[in-house]
């Protein structure tokens, strides 16, 4: 999936982001809509952005803890993000990392 996507050319891209399991509890929401800055083109860069925006729970966005999906298909972290994508972050272990309660 990641290889088949094209570069966006600097257009504004909106995605729908879903959180599951303990990640929904840590973030306090099950989903949100984001407008991606031009610097965020892949799932890895999205996780970097989330770590910066939610620095109190940055450990929760570690790649080793999550399995991403893009448009309901499991995806690699290098998968490019396009306008209208649905991205889900699914924890790959049942217990969350230790982070301060918010």
Protein language model features and the residues they cover:
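Ubiquitin-like/PB1-type beta-grasp interaction modules and other compact soluble beta-rich domains
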Residues: 1-102
């Amino acid at each position: 999936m990641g290889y088949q996507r094209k570069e966006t050319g600097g257009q504004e891209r909106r995605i729908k982001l879903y959180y599951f399991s303990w990640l929904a509890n840590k973030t306090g929401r099950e989903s949100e809509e984001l407008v991606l800055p031009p610097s965020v083109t892949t799932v890895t860069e999205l996780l970097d952005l989330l770590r910066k925006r939610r620095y109190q729970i940055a450990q929760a966005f570690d790649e080793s803890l999550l399995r991403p999906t893009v448009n309901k298909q499991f995806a690699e972290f290098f998968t490019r993000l396009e306008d209208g994508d649905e991205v889900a972050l699914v924890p790959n272990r049942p217990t969350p990392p230790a982070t301060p309660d918010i």
